[in-house]
């Protein structure tokens, strides 16, 4: 009833991470597990697991980070943030996975906010090496009825910077979220 959701486990190489568990009545949603890194050329990194949802007073769990891609492959997408409880914000989206010469994984979408709370921030796009493209930032989560949408995530850095994410929609009485910053070009990104 009052417990937090359990965290999702990490994925096997190239596999999706486990989803975070839902929270009890007043607990926080569990964080999503990280996607598995790929060591095989051409194989995409695993996607991050989704964050667990909260019920009443707790925030949604954060999405897991995407795994790094094998040589020439894209990084895995970040997991989506869990929905926030009635009075709490949505979880942030997970980071996109790193790619050496491919495209960094997209950042995860922020979780929706509860009735009176803002949406979660979108995850940062995955970085890439100098020959790759940074991942797109995640979309901000939608705001609750009386709250603003979450900000979009920043684009990942790389040979070409990734586009910033879109801000989340505001609730009926809330403002929309700000868009994310574009990623830095001609830069070796990190995970």
Indicate residue ranges for each PLM-predicted region:
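Collagen-like Gly-X-Y triplet repeats in extracellular proteins
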Residues: 1-191
């Amino acid at each position: 009833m009052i417990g937090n959701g359990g965290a999702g486990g990490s994925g096997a190489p190239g596999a999706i991470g486990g989803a975070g568990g839902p929270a009890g009545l007043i607990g926080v949603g569990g964080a999503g597990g990280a996607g598995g890194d790929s060591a095989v050329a051409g194989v995409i990194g695993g996607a991050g697991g989704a964050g667990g949802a909260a019920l009443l007073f707790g925030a949604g769990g954060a999405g897991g980070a995407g795994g790094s891609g094998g040589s020439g492959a894209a990084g895995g997408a970040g997991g989506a943030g869990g929905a926030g409880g009635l009075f709490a914000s949505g979880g942030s989206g997970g980071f996109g996975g790193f790619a050496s010469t491919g495209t960094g994984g997209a950042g995860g979408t922020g979780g929706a906010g509860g009735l009176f709370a803002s949406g979660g921030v979108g995850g940062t796009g995955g970085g890439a090496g100098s020959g790759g493209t940074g991942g797109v930032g995640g979309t901000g989560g939608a705001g609750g009825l009386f709250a603003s949408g979450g900000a979009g995530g920043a684009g990942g850095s790389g040979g070409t910077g990734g586009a910033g994410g879109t801000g989340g929609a505001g609730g009926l009485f809330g403002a929309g979220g700000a868009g994310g910053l574009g990623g830095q070009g001609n830069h070796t990104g990190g995970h």
